[in-house]
């Protein structure tokens, strides 16, 4: 009986930490934060029914063949930082003019970065990532994890691994303003 108790105790000690470990992204806190980031994007006029339409440009995977970038400083939960919203458009033979004339028809997803407080993820310049569907719901990866937070941190592919390669070291490809 004592050996059986020791085996059960050892098994519990090894497995309980696995279940209590936080997911690297897409956890409840990330989902709550993603909703706040989406609301800030609406309030900024970047997404939603009355969204600003800027001049789209030709893009590339994984975001889309036509992209639109909008950004400004916003405050979320007392943290002020850059909000970078990328609208990702797709469609067969899509052109910039197609998107200008009917952006809602071609919008496939919206990817957002928000620079969080110092220490949120210092190794990755404190960026929060979210990938949203056009209706504001979070997109999911093939494993069903919601794409919000430190998306794919430590993975060979995904938001963070790609953005580490951005020139200037600020995790933004279009410019180097957020060093």
Language model: regions and residue ranges:
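N-terminal signal peptide c-region/cleavage motif recognized by signal peptidases
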Residues: 17-20
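Sequence context surrounding c-type heme c attachment/ligation sites in exported
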Residues: 24-29, 76, 80-179
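N-terminal secretory signal peptides
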Residues: 23-93
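Bacterial N-terminal signal peptides that target proteins for export
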Residues: 1-11
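A residue-level detector for conformationally permissive "hinge/kink" positions
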Residues: 7, 70-73, 128
């Amino acid at each position: 009986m004592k050996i059986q108790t020791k085996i059960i105790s050892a098994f519990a000690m090894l497995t309980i930490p696995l279940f209590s470990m936080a997911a690297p992204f897409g956890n409840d806190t990330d989902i709550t934060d993603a909703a706040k980031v989406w609301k800030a994007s609406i309030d900024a006029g970047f997404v939603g029914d009355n969204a600003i339409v800027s001049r789209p440009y030709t893009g590339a995977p994984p975001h889309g063949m036509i992209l639109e970038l909008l950004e400004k400083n916003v405050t979320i939960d007392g943290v002020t930082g850059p909000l970078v919203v990328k609208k990702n458009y797709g469609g067969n033979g899509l052109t910039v003019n197609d998107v200008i004339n009917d952006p809602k028809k071609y919008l496939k997803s919206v990817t957002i970065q928000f620079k969080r407080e110092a220490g949120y993820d210092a190794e990755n310049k404190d960026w929060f990532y979210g990938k949203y569907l056009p209706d504001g719901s979070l997109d999911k990866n093939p494993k069903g994890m919601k794409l919000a937070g430190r998306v794919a941190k430590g993975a060979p592919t995904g938001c963070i691994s790609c953005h580490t390669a951005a020139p200037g070291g600020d995790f933004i490809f279009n410019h180097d303003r957020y060093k």
